[in-house]
Regions:
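Generic structural motif
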Residues: 18, 49-53, 87-89, 101, ...
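Solvent-exposed edge beta-strands and adjacent loop segments
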Residues: 1-56, 100-118
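Short, cationic low-complexity segments
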Residues: 65-83, 140-155
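Beta-strand secondary-structure signal
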Residues: 43-47, 81-83, 120-124
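Mixed-charge, glycine-accented linear interaction segment located at domain edges/termini
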Residues: 94-155
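Charged, amphipathic alpha-helical segments
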Residues: 49-72
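Acidic, glycine-rich flexible loop segments
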Residues: 69-111
C-alpha cells in the first residue's frame, strides 16, 4: 500500500558509480584484472511544497495533533517503499519502485512573501534481505501505457 503525494516537485537520482579496483603486475602499466565494487550508497531526493503535518511525520518522524506537527526528540529510523511515476509522455509513463529506503526529511526552505516552505526528503536505497537471508533487487523501473480512467458504473 502506498501513500499518494501528488505535489512532489522535482526528483533527483543520485545513483552511485561502481568503484574499480585494478590489479597490476610489478613493472607493468596495464592491469591484469579489474574488479568492480559497489560505490557509495545510491539515493533519491525530492521536495514536497507546503507539507502537511502528516507528510512531515511520515518523512521526519515526530507527532501530530490535528494540523500541528511537533519535531521528534531524537532522530527516528524511517524505512519505506517508494513508488515514483513520471508525467505521461507519448501515451506512456515510467514507474520506479524502490523496495527499501531509509528516509531522512528536513525543512529546507522557510516560507516567505512569495514562496512556501519545502520539505526536502533524501531516501537512501537499501538492498532488501528476506528472513532467510536472500537478497533481492533494490529497485525496478518499468515503462507502462497510460490507460483512461474507468468511469463509475451507473445503477
Amino acid at each position: 500500500e502506498y501513500t499518494q503525494y501528488p505535489e512532489i516537485d522535482t526528483v533527483t537520482f543520485n545513483f552511485s558509480e561502481p568503484k574499480e579496483i585494478s590489479f597490476t603486475a610489478m613493472g607493468r602499466e596495464d592491469p591484469w584484472a579489474v574488479v568492480s565494487k559497489k560505490g557509495d550508497p545510491s539515493s533519491i531526493e525530492y521536495t514536497i511544497p507546503s507539507p502537511t503535518a502528516e507528510e512531515l511525520k511520515a518523512h521526519c518522524g515526530g507527532t501530530v495533533t490535528g494540523d500541528k506537527w511537533e519535531a521528534p526528540v531524537s532522530t527516528p529510523t524511517i524505512i519505506k517503499t517508494i513508488k515514483l511515476q513520471s508525467s505521461p509522455y507519448n501515451g506512456k509513463y515510467t514507474e520506479y519502485v524502490f523496495v527499501k529506503a531509509s528516509i531522512a526529511g528536513r525543512l529546507s526552505q522557510a516560507p516567505g512573501k512569495e514562496e512556501t516552505d519545502l520539505l526536502l526528503v533524501k531516501a537512501t536505497i537499501m538492498t532488501p534481505v528476506s528472513a532467510a537471508g536472500v537478497r533481492s533487487a533494490p529497485y525496478c523501473r518499468e515503462v507502462k501505457p497510460v490507460t483512461a480512467p474507468v468511469p463509475p458504473s451507473e445503477s
